[in-house]
Amino acid sequence: MCHRSPGRSLRPPSPLLLLLPLLLQPPWAAGAASQSDPTGVHCATAYWSPESKKVEIKTVLDKNGDAYGYYNDSIKTTGWGILEIRAGYGSQVLSNEIIMFLAGYLEGYLTALHMYDHFTNLYPQLIKNPSIVKKVQDFMEKQEMWTRQNIKAQKDDPFWRHTGYVVTQLDGLYLGAQKRASEEKIKPMTMFQIQFLNAVGDLLDLIPSLSPTKSSSMMKFKIWEMGHCSALIKVLPGFENIYFAHSSWYTYAAMLRIYKHWDFNIKDKYTLSKRLSFSSYPGFLESLDDFYILSSGLILLQTTNSVYNKTLLKQVVPKTLLAWQRVRVANMMAEGGKEWAQIFSKHNSGTYNNQYMVLDLKKVTINRSLDKGTLYIVEQIPTYVEYSDQTNVLRKGYWASYNIPFHKTIYNWSGYPLLVHKLGLDYSYDLAPRAKIFRRDQGNVTDMASMKYIMRYNNYKEDPYSKGDPCSTICCREDLNGASPSPGGCYDTKVADIFLASQYKAYAISGPTVQDGLPPFNWNRFNETLHRGMPEVFDFNFVTMKPILS
Protein backbone atom coordinates (compact mmCIF):
# COMPACT_ATOMS: atom_id res chain seq x y z
CA MET A 1 0.00 0.00 0.00
CA CYS A 2 1.20 3.51 -0.81
CA HIS A 3 1.88 5.96 2.01
CA ARG A 4 -0.14 9.13 1.48
CA SER A 5 0.66 12.71 2.38
CA PRO A 6 -0.87 16.03 1.22
CA GLY A 7 0.26 17.15 -2.22
CA ARG A 8 1.19 20.76 -2.88
CA SER A 9 2.22 22.81 -5.88
CA LEU A 10 5.62 24.25 -6.67
CA ARG A 11 6.27 26.68 -9.47
CA PRO A 12 9.63 25.83 -11.07
CA PRO A 13 11.57 28.06 -13.41
CA SER A 14 11.54 27.01 -17.07
CA PRO A 15 12.81 23.44 -16.91
CA LEU A 16 14.84 23.50 -20.11
CA LEU A 17 18.20 25.24 -19.77
CA LEU A 18 17.42 26.19 -16.20
CA LEU A 19 20.43 28.25 -15.18
CA LEU A 20 20.51 27.25 -11.55
CA PRO A 21 23.53 28.79 -9.83
CA LEU A 22 25.85 26.54 -7.91
CA LEU A 23 25.18 27.27 -4.30
CA LEU A 24 28.43 27.84 -2.51
CA GLN A 25 26.98 27.02 0.87
CA PRO A 26 29.18 24.36 2.50
CA PRO A 27 27.55 20.96 1.92
CA TRP A 28 27.73 20.05 5.60
CA ALA A 29 25.49 23.01 6.44
CA ALA A 30 22.39 21.53 4.83
CA GLY A 31 20.73 20.30 7.97
CA ALA A 32 22.32 17.48 9.90
CA ALA A 33 19.29 16.15 11.72
CA SER A 34 18.58 12.57 10.72
CA GLN A 35 15.20 12.03 9.12
CA SER A 36 13.44 8.69 9.12
CA ASP A 37 11.68 7.71 5.90
CA PRO A 38 9.10 5.08 6.86
CA THR A 39 9.61 1.84 5.01
CA GLY A 40 6.97 0.62 2.61
CA VAL A 41 5.73 1.47 -0.86
CA HIS A 42 5.35 5.19 -1.60
CA CYS A 43 3.32 6.07 -4.70
CA ALA A 44 3.06 9.47 -6.37
CA THR A 45 1.85 11.10 -9.56
CA ALA A 46 3.06 14.39 -11.04
CA TYR A 47 0.71 16.66 -13.00
CA TRP A 48 1.97 19.49 -15.21
CA SER A 49 -0.10 22.62 -15.82
CA PRO A 50 1.00 24.25 -19.11
CA GLU A 51 -0.86 27.45 -18.26
CA SER A 52 0.59 28.05 -14.82
CA LYS A 53 3.79 26.02 -15.37
CA LYS A 54 3.22 24.36 -12.01
CA VAL A 55 3.81 20.80 -10.89
CA GLU A 56 1.26 19.20 -8.61
CA ILE A 57 2.08 16.01 -6.72
CA LYS A 58 -0.57 13.62 -5.48
CA THR A 59 0.34 10.54 -3.47
CA VAL A 60 -1.64 8.20 -5.69
CA LEU A 61 -0.76 6.03 -8.67
CA ASP A 62 -2.64 7.63 -11.57
CA LYS A 63 -1.82 6.27 -15.02
CA ASN A 64 -3.47 9.31 -16.58
CA GLY A 65 -0.98 11.56 -14.82
CA ASP A 66 2.00 13.08 -16.59
CA ALA A 67 4.51 11.05 -14.57
CA TYR A 68 3.68 8.32 -12.08
CA GLY A 69 5.52 5.69 -10.13
CA TYR A 70 6.46 4.23 -6.80
CA TYR A 71 9.41 3.85 -4.47
CA ASN A 72 9.57 0.63 -2.46
CA ASP A 73 11.75 1.53 0.52
CA SER A 74 12.89 -2.00 1.34
CA ILE A 75 16.58 -1.27 1.92
CA LYS A 76 16.46 -2.43 5.54
CA THR A 77 14.79 -5.75 4.66
CA THR A 78 16.31 -6.75 1.29
CA GLY A 79 19.28 -4.39 0.84
CA TRP A 80 17.58 -2.63 -2.08
CA GLY A 81 15.06 0.11 -2.64
CA ILE A 82 13.11 -0.22 -5.87
CA LEU A 83 12.02 2.79 -7.93
CA GLU A 84 9.81 2.64 -11.00
CA ILE A 85 8.73 5.71 -12.98
CA ARG A 86 6.74 6.13 -16.19
CA ALA A 87 6.53 9.59 -17.74
CA GLY A 88 4.81 11.01 -20.80
CA TYR A 89 2.05 8.39 -20.99
CA GLY A 90 -0.72 10.52 -19.48
CA SER A 91 -3.76 12.18 -20.95
CA GLN A 92 -2.01 15.30 -22.23
CA VAL A 93 0.69 15.70 -24.85
CA LEU A 94 3.92 17.09 -23.40
CA SER A 95 7.23 18.17 -24.87
CA ASN A 96 10.19 15.83 -24.42
CA GLU A 97 11.80 18.37 -22.11
CA ILE A 98 8.77 18.50 -19.81
CA ILE A 99 8.58 14.69 -19.76
CA MET A 100 12.21 14.46 -18.64
CA PHE A 101 11.73 17.27 -16.13
CA LEU A 102 8.72 15.54 -14.56
CA ALA A 103 10.52 12.19 -14.45
CA GLY A 104 13.34 13.80 -12.49
CA TYR A 105 10.91 15.75 -10.32
CA LEU A 106 8.99 12.62 -9.31
CA GLU A 107 12.19 10.72 -8.53
CA GLY A 108 13.46 13.59 -6.41
CA TYR A 109 10.17 13.75 -4.54
CA LEU A 110 10.00 10.00 -3.86
CA THR A 111 13.64 9.47 -2.86
CA ALA A 112 14.66 12.82 -1.34
CA LEU A 113 15.32 11.55 2.18
CA HIS A 114 17.60 8.76 1.02
CA MET A 115 19.29 11.21 -1.35
CA TYR A 116 20.40 13.29 1.60
CA ASP A 117 21.48 10.18 3.53
CA HIS A 118 23.56 9.06 0.56
CA PHE A 119 25.22 12.46 0.21
CA THR A 120 25.99 12.52 3.94
CA ASN A 121 27.64 9.10 3.68
CA LEU A 122 29.67 9.75 0.53
CA TYR A 123 30.84 13.32 1.04
CA PRO A 124 33.54 12.53 3.64
CA GLN A 125 34.72 9.59 1.52
CA LEU A 126 35.56 11.92 -1.36
CA ILE A 127 36.40 15.19 0.39
CA LYS A 128 39.35 14.35 2.60
CA ASN A 129 40.68 17.91 2.51
CA PRO A 130 38.13 20.77 2.88
CA SER A 131 40.36 23.08 0.84
CA ILE A 132 39.45 21.15 -2.31
CA VAL A 133 35.72 21.97 -2.09
CA LYS A 134 36.00 25.42 -3.69
CA LYS A 135 38.06 24.02 -6.58
CA VAL A 136 35.47 21.29 -7.17
CA GLN A 137 32.63 23.82 -7.05
CA ASP A 138 34.40 26.16 -9.46
CA PHE A 139 35.09 23.33 -11.91
CA MET A 140 31.53 22.04 -11.77
CA GLU A 141 30.07 25.53 -12.17
CA LYS A 142 32.16 26.15 -15.30
CA GLN A 143 31.32 22.71 -16.67
CA GLU A 144 27.60 23.23 -16.06
CA MET A 145 27.53 26.66 -17.71
CA TRP A 146 29.47 25.40 -20.74
CA THR A 147 27.07 22.47 -21.07
CA ARG A 148 23.94 24.62 -20.82
CA GLN A 149 25.34 27.14 -23.30
CA ASN A 150 25.93 24.38 -25.85
CA ILE A 151 22.45 22.93 -25.31
CA LYS A 152 20.93 26.35 -25.91
CA ALA A 153 23.09 27.16 -28.93
CA GLN A 154 22.75 23.79 -30.68
CA LYS A 155 19.09 22.86 -30.32
CA ASP A 156 19.02 21.18 -33.74
CA ASP A 157 21.95 18.89 -32.92
CA PRO A 158 20.58 15.52 -31.71
CA PHE A 159 23.57 15.00 -29.41
CA TRP A 160 23.09 18.29 -27.61
CA ARG A 161 19.32 17.91 -27.60
CA HIS A 162 19.70 14.63 -25.71
CA THR A 163 22.23 16.21 -23.39
CA GLY A 164 19.50 18.77 -22.73
CA TYR A 165 17.08 16.00 -21.81
CA VAL A 166 19.53 14.72 -19.19
CA VAL A 167 20.20 18.19 -17.76
CA THR A 168 16.47 18.90 -17.62
CA GLN A 169 15.92 15.66 -15.72
CA LEU A 170 18.56 16.78 -13.21
CA ASP A 171 16.77 20.12 -12.78
CA GLY A 172 13.59 18.21 -12.04
CA LEU A 173 15.36 15.97 -9.55
CA TYR A 174 16.58 19.02 -7.66
CA LEU A 175 13.17 20.69 -7.50
CA GLY A 176 11.31 17.49 -6.67
CA ALA A 177 13.65 16.84 -3.75
CA GLN A 178 13.18 20.46 -2.71
CA LYS A 179 9.41 20.00 -2.62
CA ARG A 180 9.70 16.88 -0.48
CA ALA A 181 12.04 18.68 1.90
CA SER A 182 9.49 21.48 2.31
CA GLU A 183 6.81 18.92 3.20
CA GLU A 184 9.10 17.21 5.70
CA LYS A 185 10.16 20.61 7.09
CA ILE A 186 13.85 19.91 6.61
CA LYS A 187 16.54 21.95 4.86
CA PRO A 188 16.59 21.07 1.15
CA MET A 189 19.66 19.80 -0.64
CA THR A 190 21.53 22.36 -2.70
CA MET A 191 22.01 21.98 -6.43
CA PHE A 192 25.73 21.53 -5.81
CA GLN A 193 25.05 18.58 -3.52
CA ILE A 194 22.88 16.89 -6.16
CA GLN A 195 25.48 17.56 -8.86
CA PHE A 196 28.11 16.17 -6.48
CA LEU A 197 26.13 12.94 -6.12
CA ASN A 198 25.73 12.47 -9.86
CA ALA A 199 29.41 13.20 -10.44
CA VAL A 200 30.73 10.78 -7.79
CA GLY A 201 32.42 8.60 -10.40
CA ASP A 202 33.90 11.61 -12.18
CA LEU A 203 35.10 13.03 -8.86
CA LEU A 204 37.32 9.97 -8.37
CA ASP A 205 39.54 11.45 -11.09
CA LEU A 206 38.56 15.11 -10.89
CA ILE A 207 39.66 15.57 -7.27
CA PRO A 208 43.18 14.15 -7.87
CA SER A 209 43.46 16.33 -10.99
CA LEU A 210 42.69 19.42 -8.88
CA SER A 211 45.01 18.47 -6.03
CA PRO A 212 48.02 16.68 -7.49
CA THR A 213 50.46 15.21 -5.01
CA LYS A 214 54.19 15.47 -5.55
CA SER A 215 54.77 11.84 -4.67
CA SER A 216 52.82 8.95 -3.32
CA SER A 217 53.59 5.38 -2.44
CA MET A 218 51.99 2.91 -4.81
CA MET A 219 51.98 0.39 -1.99
CA LYS A 220 49.40 2.47 -0.11
CA PHE A 221 46.93 2.18 -2.97
CA LYS A 222 43.73 0.31 -2.11
CA ILE A 223 42.10 -1.09 -5.21
CA TRP A 224 38.50 -0.68 -3.97
CA GLU A 225 38.89 3.04 -3.22
CA MET A 226 38.61 4.01 -6.89
CA GLY A 227 35.33 2.21 -7.48
CA HIS A 228 36.77 -0.96 -8.96
CA CYS A 229 34.50 -3.81 -10.00
CA SER A 230 34.35 -7.28 -11.54
CA ALA A 231 32.29 -8.09 -14.64
CA LEU A 232 31.75 -11.24 -16.68
CA ILE A 233 29.94 -12.04 -19.91
CA LYS A 234 29.64 -15.80 -20.38
CA VAL A 235 28.46 -17.65 -23.50
CA LEU A 236 27.51 -21.31 -23.20
CA PRO A 237 29.43 -23.67 -25.52
CA GLY A 238 26.59 -24.15 -28.01
CA PHE A 239 25.44 -20.52 -27.74
CA GLU A 240 22.42 -21.82 -25.80
CA ASN A 241 22.48 -18.73 -23.57
CA ILE A 242 24.53 -15.66 -22.80
CA TYR A 243 24.87 -14.50 -19.20
CA PHE A 244 26.13 -11.13 -18.02
CA ALA A 245 26.93 -9.97 -14.50
CA HIS A 246 28.58 -7.20 -12.53
CA SER A 247 29.86 -6.90 -8.95
CA SER A 248 30.56 -3.37 -7.67
CA TRP A 249 33.60 -2.50 -5.54
CA TYR A 250 33.84 0.76 -3.61
CA THR A 251 33.59 2.04 -0.06
CA TYR A 252 30.82 0.34 1.93
CA ALA A 253 29.59 3.87 2.71
CA ALA A 254 28.01 3.68 -0.76
CA MET A 255 25.75 0.70 0.07
CA LEU A 256 22.52 2.73 0.08
CA ARG A 257 21.05 1.21 -3.06
CA ILE A 258 18.09 1.70 -5.38
CA TYR A 259 17.31 -0.48 -8.39
CA LYS A 260 15.52 1.67 -10.97
CA HIS A 261 13.07 1.05 -13.82
CA TRP A 262 12.42 4.03 -16.09
CA ASP A 263 10.02 4.29 -19.04
CA PHE A 264 9.93 7.75 -20.64
CA ASN A 265 7.75 8.35 -23.70
CA ILE A 266 10.24 10.53 -25.58
CA LYS A 267 9.19 11.30 -29.15
CA ASP A 268 12.50 11.95 -30.88
CA LYS A 269 13.62 9.93 -33.90
CA TYR A 270 17.14 9.87 -32.48
CA THR A 271 16.01 8.35 -29.16
CA LEU A 272 16.49 4.60 -29.52
CA SER A 273 16.18 3.66 -25.86
CA LYS A 274 13.22 5.11 -23.99
CA ARG A 275 13.03 2.38 -21.40
CA LEU A 276 15.73 0.96 -19.13
CA SER A 277 16.36 -0.94 -15.92
CA PHE A 278 19.56 -0.49 -13.95
CA SER A 279 21.26 -0.70 -10.57
CA SER A 280 21.75 2.69 -8.97
CA TYR A 281 21.76 4.86 -5.85
CA PRO A 282 19.63 7.64 -4.31
CA GLY A 283 19.96 10.87 -6.27
CA PHE A 284 21.88 9.30 -9.16
CA LEU A 285 20.50 9.69 -12.68
CA GLU A 286 22.96 7.02 -13.79
CA SER A 287 24.03 3.58 -12.64
CA LEU A 288 27.66 4.33 -11.63
CA ASP A 289 28.30 0.57 -11.37
CA ASP A 290 27.46 0.28 -14.44
CA PHE A 291 24.71 -2.28 -15.07
CA TYR A 292 22.04 -1.28 -17.61
CA ILE A 293 19.41 -3.18 -19.58
CA LEU A 294 18.24 -0.88 -22.42
CA SER A 295 15.20 -1.10 -24.70
CA SER A 296 17.53 -0.74 -27.69
CA GLY A 297 18.70 -4.29 -26.99
CA LEU A 298 22.00 -3.09 -25.55
CA ILE A 299 23.48 -4.16 -22.24
CA LEU A 300 26.06 -1.89 -20.64
CA LEU A 301 28.57 -3.06 -18.03
CA GLN A 302 31.62 -1.19 -16.76
CA THR A 303 34.70 -1.55 -14.58
CA THR A 304 37.09 1.25 -13.63
CA ASN A 305 40.64 1.63 -14.92
CA SER A 306 42.91 3.71 -12.72
CA VAL A 307 45.16 6.30 -14.34
CA TYR A 308 48.61 6.10 -12.73
CA ASN A 309 50.13 8.53 -15.24
CA LYS A 310 49.41 11.74 -13.35
CA THR A 311 50.42 13.96 -16.27
CA LEU A 312 47.29 12.72 -18.05
CA LEU A 313 45.12 14.08 -15.26
CA LYS A 314 46.44 17.57 -16.02
CA GLN A 315 44.38 17.38 -19.22
CA VAL A 316 41.08 17.41 -17.30
CA VAL A 317 39.26 20.66 -18.13
CA PRO A 318 35.70 21.91 -17.49
CA LYS A 319 34.67 22.50 -21.12
CA THR A 320 33.75 18.85 -21.54
CA LEU A 321 30.91 16.50 -20.64
CA LEU A 322 31.28 14.34 -17.55
CA ALA A 323 31.30 10.58 -18.02
CA TRP A 324 27.91 10.11 -16.37
CA GLN A 325 26.35 12.57 -18.84
CA ARG A 326 27.97 10.96 -21.89
CA VAL A 327 26.88 7.49 -20.78
CA ARG A 328 23.28 8.66 -20.46
CA VAL A 329 23.30 10.30 -23.89
CA ALA A 330 24.93 7.28 -25.56
CA ASN A 331 22.45 4.96 -23.84
CA MET A 332 19.54 6.97 -25.23
CA MET A 333 20.84 7.42 -28.78
CA ALA A 334 22.90 4.36 -29.74
CA GLU A 335 21.60 1.43 -31.76
CA GLY A 336 24.78 -0.66 -31.52
CA GLY A 337 28.11 -0.88 -29.73
CA LYS A 338 30.14 1.08 -32.27
CA GLU A 339 27.61 3.91 -32.32
CA TRP A 340 27.55 3.89 -28.51
CA ALA A 341 31.33 4.32 -28.47
CA GLN A 342 31.26 7.13 -31.02
CA ILE A 343 28.63 9.08 -29.08
CA PHE A 344 30.35 8.47 -25.75
CA SER A 345 33.67 9.72 -27.16
CA LYS A 346 32.37 13.24 -27.77
CA HIS A 347 33.66 15.93 -25.39
CA ASN A 348 35.63 13.46 -23.25
CA SER A 349 36.18 14.86 -19.75
CA GLY A 350 38.91 12.37 -18.89
CA THR A 351 37.12 11.63 -15.63
CA TYR A 352 35.78 8.28 -14.44
CA ASN A 353 38.12 6.42 -16.75
CA ASN A 354 36.57 3.03 -17.36
CA GLN A 355 36.30 -0.03 -19.51
CA TYR A 356 32.75 -0.24 -20.88
CA MET A 357 31.33 -3.47 -22.27
CA VAL A 358 28.52 -2.84 -24.77
CA LEU A 359 26.72 -6.12 -25.44
CA ASP A 360 24.23 -6.00 -28.32
CA LEU A 361 21.68 -8.76 -27.78
CA LYS A 362 20.15 -8.00 -31.20
CA LYS A 363 23.26 -9.58 -32.70
CA VAL A 364 22.80 -12.85 -30.79
CA THR A 365 20.91 -15.78 -32.30
CA ILE A 366 20.51 -18.44 -29.62
CA ASN A 367 21.92 -21.87 -30.61
CA ARG A 368 23.31 -20.39 -33.81
CA SER A 369 25.56 -17.31 -33.85
CA LEU A 370 27.07 -14.20 -32.32
CA ASP A 371 27.21 -11.76 -35.21
CA LYS A 372 29.87 -9.12 -35.71
CA GLY A 373 29.26 -6.22 -33.32
CA THR A 374 27.87 -8.36 -30.49
CA LEU A 375 30.50 -7.03 -28.07
CA TYR A 376 32.28 -3.69 -28.20
CA ILE A 377 34.91 -2.77 -25.62
CA VAL A 378 35.27 0.96 -24.99
CA GLU A 379 38.04 2.45 -22.82
CA GLN A 380 38.68 6.06 -21.85
CA ILE A 381 41.58 8.06 -20.48
CA PRO A 382 42.02 11.86 -20.57
CA THR A 383 42.19 13.08 -24.21
CA TYR A 384 41.64 9.60 -25.70
CA VAL A 385 38.91 6.97 -26.13
CA GLU A 386 39.61 3.64 -27.84
CA TYR A 387 37.05 1.02 -28.84
CA SER A 388 37.05 -2.27 -30.71
CA ASP A 389 34.81 -5.18 -31.64
CA GLN A 390 35.75 -8.11 -29.41
CA THR A 391 33.02 -10.52 -30.50
CA ASN A 392 35.69 -13.03 -31.56
CA VAL A 393 36.93 -13.26 -27.97
CA LEU A 394 33.39 -13.70 -26.68
CA ARG A 395 32.70 -16.52 -29.16
CA LYS A 396 35.43 -18.51 -27.43
CA GLY A 397 33.39 -18.49 -24.24
CA TYR A 398 33.71 -15.37 -22.11
CA TRP A 399 34.80 -11.80 -21.56
CA ALA A 400 36.04 -10.85 -18.10
CA SER A 401 36.73 -7.34 -16.82
CA TYR A 402 38.74 -6.63 -13.68
CA ASN A 403 40.08 -3.06 -13.65
CA ILE A 404 43.06 -3.48 -15.95
CA PRO A 405 42.89 -1.91 -19.44
CA PHE A 406 42.55 -4.23 -22.42
CA HIS A 407 43.70 -1.91 -25.22
CA LYS A 408 47.48 -1.68 -25.35
CA THR A 409 47.62 2.09 -25.85
CA ILE A 410 45.31 2.73 -22.90
CA TYR A 411 47.28 0.22 -20.79
CA ASN A 412 50.61 1.84 -21.59
CA TRP A 413 49.55 5.48 -21.32
CA SER A 414 47.80 4.81 -18.01
CA GLY A 415 51.09 3.71 -16.46
CA TYR A 416 50.48 0.00 -15.96
CA PRO A 417 53.87 -1.20 -17.32
CA LEU A 418 55.64 0.81 -14.59
CA LEU A 419 53.24 -0.60 -12.02
CA VAL A 420 54.05 -4.15 -13.13
CA HIS A 421 57.76 -3.34 -12.94
CA LYS A 422 57.44 -1.97 -9.39
CA LEU A 423 54.72 -4.18 -7.89
CA GLY A 424 54.61 -7.31 -10.01
CA LEU A 425 52.31 -9.23 -12.33
CA ASP A 426 49.20 -8.64 -10.22
CA TYR A 427 48.80 -5.47 -12.32
CA SER A 428 49.25 -7.15 -15.70
CA TYR A 429 46.26 -7.78 -17.94
CA ASP A 430 46.84 -11.51 -18.37
CA LEU A 431 48.11 -12.49 -14.93
CA ALA A 432 46.19 -10.36 -12.45
CA PRO A 433 44.59 -12.56 -9.76
CA ARG A 434 41.08 -12.08 -11.12
CA ALA A 435 42.25 -12.77 -14.69
CA LYS A 436 43.56 -16.14 -13.52
CA ILE A 437 40.49 -16.96 -11.43
CA PHE A 438 38.06 -16.06 -14.22
CA ARG A 439 40.13 -18.06 -16.73
CA ARG A 440 40.15 -21.08 -14.41
CA ASP A 441 36.52 -21.00 -13.24
CA GLN A 442 34.43 -19.52 -16.08
CA GLY A 443 34.05 -23.00 -17.57
CA ASN A 444 32.07 -24.00 -14.49
CA VAL A 445 29.32 -21.53 -15.41
CA THR A 446 26.48 -23.57 -16.88
CA ASP A 447 23.37 -21.88 -15.47
CA MET A 448 22.16 -18.93 -13.42
CA ALA A 449 23.17 -20.46 -10.09
CA SER A 450 26.78 -21.00 -11.18
CA MET A 451 26.92 -17.50 -12.68
CA LYS A 452 25.81 -16.05 -9.36
CA TYR A 453 28.40 -18.19 -7.60
CA ILE A 454 31.41 -17.03 -9.62
CA MET A 455 30.45 -13.37 -9.20
CA ARG A 456 30.24 -13.74 -5.38
CA TYR A 457 33.38 -15.87 -5.22
CA ASN A 458 35.88 -15.21 -2.43
CA ASN A 459 37.93 -18.12 -1.13
CA TYR A 460 40.93 -16.00 -0.21
CA LYS A 461 42.15 -18.32 2.54
CA GLU A 462 42.45 -21.36 0.27
CA ASP A 463 42.70 -20.12 -3.32
CA PRO A 464 46.36 -20.10 -4.45
CA TYR A 465 45.69 -17.12 -6.74
CA SER A 466 44.46 -14.99 -3.82
CA LYS A 467 47.53 -15.64 -1.65
CA GLY A 468 45.59 -14.83 1.51
CA ASP A 469 44.46 -11.39 0.26
CA PRO A 470 40.65 -10.98 0.58
CA CYS A 471 40.71 -8.54 -2.36
CA SER A 472 42.72 -10.69 -4.77
CA THR A 473 39.54 -12.40 -5.87
CA ILE A 474 36.26 -11.78 -7.68
CA CYS A 475 34.31 -10.27 -4.76
CA CYS A 476 36.68 -8.36 -2.46
CA ARG A 477 36.21 -8.21 1.34
CA GLU A 478 38.74 -5.62 2.56
CA ASP A 479 36.96 -5.61 5.92
CA LEU A 480 38.40 -9.12 6.42
CA ASN A 481 41.99 -7.98 5.86
CA GLY A 482 43.69 -9.12 9.03
CA ALA A 483 46.48 -6.53 8.89
CA SER A 484 44.44 -3.39 8.16
CA PRO A 485 40.70 -3.99 7.74
CA SER A 486 38.72 -1.25 5.98
CA PRO A 487 34.99 -0.97 5.19
CA GLY A 488 35.31 -1.38 1.46
CA GLY A 489 35.26 -3.91 -1.31
CA CYS A 490 32.67 -5.78 -3.35
CA TYR A 491 29.18 -4.93 -2.11
CA ASP A 492 26.70 -6.19 -4.69
CA THR A 493 26.12 -8.48 -7.67
CA LYS A 494 23.67 -8.15 -10.56
CA VAL A 495 23.08 -11.08 -12.91
CA ALA A 496 20.87 -11.67 -15.96
CA ASP A 497 20.79 -13.50 -19.28
CA ILE A 498 19.42 -12.87 -22.75
CA PHE A 499 15.98 -14.21 -21.83
CA LEU A 500 15.64 -12.18 -18.64
CA ALA A 501 16.87 -9.04 -20.38
CA SER A 502 13.95 -9.20 -22.82
CA GLN A 503 11.72 -8.64 -19.76
CA TYR A 504 14.05 -6.02 -18.18
CA LYS A 505 14.54 -8.59 -15.44
CA ALA A 506 17.65 -9.31 -13.34
CA TYR A 507 18.70 -10.84 -10.04
CA ALA A 508 20.50 -8.51 -7.63
CA ILE A 509 22.04 -8.96 -4.20
CA SER A 510 23.22 -6.15 -1.92
CA GLY A 511 26.10 -6.38 0.52
CA PRO A 512 29.53 -8.00 0.83
CA THR A 513 29.68 -11.67 -0.08
CA VAL A 514 28.96 -14.30 2.60
CA GLN A 515 29.53 -17.19 0.21
CA ASP A 516 31.24 -20.36 1.48
CA GLY A 517 30.97 -19.36 5.13
CA LEU A 518 32.35 -15.82 5.13
CA PRO A 519 30.84 -13.79 7.99
CA PRO A 520 28.15 -11.18 7.20
CA PHE A 521 29.39 -7.61 7.24
CA ASN A 522 28.39 -5.71 10.39
CA TRP A 523 28.77 -1.96 10.78
CA ASN A 524 29.52 -2.32 14.50
CA ARG A 525 33.19 -2.85 13.63
CA PHE A 526 33.37 0.39 11.63
CA ASN A 527 30.95 2.75 13.35
CA GLU A 528 33.17 5.76 12.65
CA THR A 529 32.24 5.46 8.96
CA LEU A 530 28.96 7.25 8.25
CA HIS A 531 26.26 4.85 7.02
CA ARG A 532 22.95 6.66 7.48
CA GLY A 533 19.87 4.84 6.25
CA MET A 534 21.57 1.45 5.97
CA PRO A 535 20.95 -1.86 7.72
CA GLU A 536 23.48 -2.59 10.46
CA VAL A 537 24.11 -6.11 9.12
CA PHE A 538 24.21 -7.12 5.44
CA ASP A 539 23.12 -10.73 5.04
CA PHE A 540 20.59 -10.69 2.20
CA ASN A 541 19.57 -12.98 -0.63
CA PHE A 542 19.25 -12.26 -4.33
CA VAL A 543 16.17 -10.18 -5.19
CA THR A 544 14.27 -10.49 -8.49
CA MET A 545 14.15 -7.08 -10.18
CA LYS A 546 11.39 -6.57 -12.72
CA PRO A 547 9.22 -3.58 -13.71
CA ILE A 548 5.54 -3.96 -12.89
CA LEU A 549 3.91 -0.79 -14.24
CA SER A 550 4.21 -1.67 -17.93
From Swiss-Prot:
The maturation cleavages that produces chains A and B are required to open the putative substrate binding pocket. Both chains A and B remain associated in the mature protein. GO terms for cellular component: lysosome. One of its GO terms (molecular function) is phospholipase activity. The keyword DNA damage does not apply. InterPro entries: PLipase_B-like, PLipase_B-like_dom1, PLipase_B-like_dom2, PLipase_B-like_dom3. Residues 1-39 form the signal peptide. Residues 210-228 form a propeptide. It is found in: Lysosome. Disulfide bonds join C471-C476, C475-C490. GO terms for biological process: lipid catabolic process. It comes from the Eukaryota. It is an enzyme of class 3 (hydrolase). The keyword Secreted does not apply. Its main location: other. Keywords: Disulfide bond, Glycoprotein, Hydrolase, Lipid degradation, Lipid metabolism, Lysosome, Signal. Glycans are attached at N72, N309, N367, N412, N527. Its EC number is 3.1.1.-. Exhibits weak phospholipase activity, acting on various phospholipids, including phosphatidylcholine, phosphatidylinositol, phosphatidylethanolamine and lysophospholipids. However, in view of the small size of the putative binding pocket, it has been proposed that it may act rather as an amidase or a peptidase. May form a homodimer, each monomer is composed of a chain A and a chain B. Belongs to the phospholipase B-like family. This is Phospholipase B-like 1. It comes from Mus musculus.
